[in-house]
Amino acid sequence: MLSTKTLPSSKAQESLQSPTKGSYWITTFGCQMNKADSERMAGILERMGYKQAEEELQADLVLYNTCTIRDNAEQKVYSYLGRQALRKKLFPQLKLIVAGCVAQQEGESLLRRVPELDLVMGPQHANRLETLLNKVETGQQVLATEELYIIEDLTTARRDSSICAWVNVIYGCNERCTYCVVPSVRGKEQSRTPPAIKREIENLANTGFKEVTLLGQNIDAYGRDLPGTTPQGRKKNTLTDLLYYIHDIEGIERIRFATSHPRYFTSRLIEACAELPKVCEHFHIPFQSGDDEILNQMRRGYKIKTYKKIIGRIRELMPNASITADVIVAFPGETNEQFQRSLSLVEEIGFDQLNTAAYSPRPNTPAALWPNQIPEEIKIERLRKLNSLVEIKAKERNVRYKDRVEEVLAENTNPKDKQQLMGRTRTNRLTFFPKVDNQGNSYKPGDLVKVRVKDIRAFSLSGVIEN
């Protein structure tokens, strides 16, 4: 149990603010799917009349949308909950909610551990937030973790950006990777229909959005659960078909998608990305390990030669494409030779960026029970070596941008320099540039700007506007 039996000291009480009635605060942990879910839940709260608080300790409804991919993310949630449990002792009107994957995984045990919680809700219940809150208002402590079919959400999301939007197209995951909890907490794959997706993107375009990122745990598995096949025997509604279907929506300048699984990244999809002008040349395709035996133990369903073939075809058709990925080091039983194969793959492919992690045992996954766990000190050392190589290769990849003119979609003012805008290239490189060009023309978020790159860093660029 996180809460204490006694109230905080008078001095501590003075440091805690009384909640502002009708205000909310959402803290999001983890992946882009969680960010999209949080935007939808914020939209529901604002439809109900809530206003976003200026800071977390002012809110009288606090929601943590949680991630359980790694243990450190989960533990961070509990530290946040301890602070809010303290507030709830002083301000009983505070509503305290845990949503997302920790909620789904822990369920009733989370309510026992943190009895101050009003609502524990899994990710499949994000669209039901209003219904669940109405139950909370009657004095109930609510648990919502049962599996259900995700109905189309008619709520307007409260977007964190007015330029770029996340659009969920497939929920859940049918894979059974031995290290991953996602299938157990997000349920089986459920694809939205193409017309529903198109309507959402059209609405975004009508309100000024310029870029959409299609989201899915395995985005390229989209449509496997939808009916219909072509005369050639393939599924009728694939991600490739969806890209063609939404491509010509007026007002949308750019289309991205994430995250891809190598098993479903077809040649037809690569060719469509090369053909369709709005689809950006950035592909996030996790490889997880550079060793075939480890991939087999992970139950990933492909070999490294398949992965290399995918990257080769992308670079053949789109030479300037950026490739990013996820990789795990120190998976149970990983030898030094197997780890070296991951380093060799990073060296060979030259990723633009990698999300790196040391293996973290997760509850209810096969790999967590295996006896050959890697000692912590070896995990740390392997991760250090990998991160060092990643930074070197990222800098090498960025050299190609030097003095090149790139199309950048301006997204925001640079918070560290109000005279600069920041945005991303088509290849997803964060880029900083002046708001005003050398002829006195001003630019704003939402503008597509030609920027000549002058300075390069490992993970960002800066330059001047090209007239």
Curated annotation (Swiss-Prot):
It holds the Pfam family UPF0004. [4Fe-4S] cluster 2 binds at residues 173, 177, 180. PANTHER family: CDK5 REGULATORY SUBUNIT-ASSOCIATED PROTEIN 1 (PTHR43020), MITOCHONDRIAL TRNA METHYLTHIOTRANSFERASE CDK5RAP1 (PTHR43020:SF2). Keywords: 4Fe-4S, Cytoplasm, Iron, Iron-sulfur, Metal-binding, S-adenosyl-L-methionine, Transferase, tRNA processing. Its cofactor is [4Fe-4S] cluster. It comes from Prochlorococcus marinus (strain MIT 9211). The keyword Transferase applies. GO terms for molecular function: 4 iron, 4 sulfur cluster binding; metal ion binding; methylthiotransferase activity. It comes from the Bacteria. Its EC number is 2.8.4.3. Belongs to the methylthiotransferase family. MiaB subfamily. InterPro entries: Elp3/MiaA/NifB-like_rSAM, Methylthiotransferase, Methylthiotransferase_CS, Methylthiotransferase_N, Methylthiotransferase_N_sf, MiaB_methiolase, rSAM, rSAM_horseshoe. GO terms for cellular component: cytoplasm. Residues 399-467 form the TRAM domain. GO terms for biological process: tRNA methylthiolation. Residues 159-396 form the Radical SAM core domain. Binds 2 [4Fe-4S] clusters. One cluster is coordinated with 3 cysteines and an exchangeable S-adenosyl-L-methionine. Monomer. It is found in: Cytoplasm. This is tRNA-2-methylthio-N(6)-dimethylallyladenosine synthase. Residues 22-138 form the MTTase N-terminal domain. [4Fe-4S] cluster 1 binds at residues 31, 67, 101. Catalyzes the methylthiolation of N6-(dimethylallyl)adenosine (i(6)A), leading to the formation of 2-methylthio-N6-(dimethylallyl)adenosine (ms(2)i(6)A) at position 37 in tRNAs that read codons beginning with uridine. It catalyses: N(6)-dimethylallyladenosine(37) in tRNA + (sulfur carrier)-SH + AH2 + 2 S-adenosyl-L-methionine = 2-methylsulfanyl-N(6)-dimethylallyladenosine(37) in tRNA + (sulfur carrier)-H + 5'-deoxyadenosine + L-methionine + A + S-adenosyl-L-homocysteine + 2 H(+).
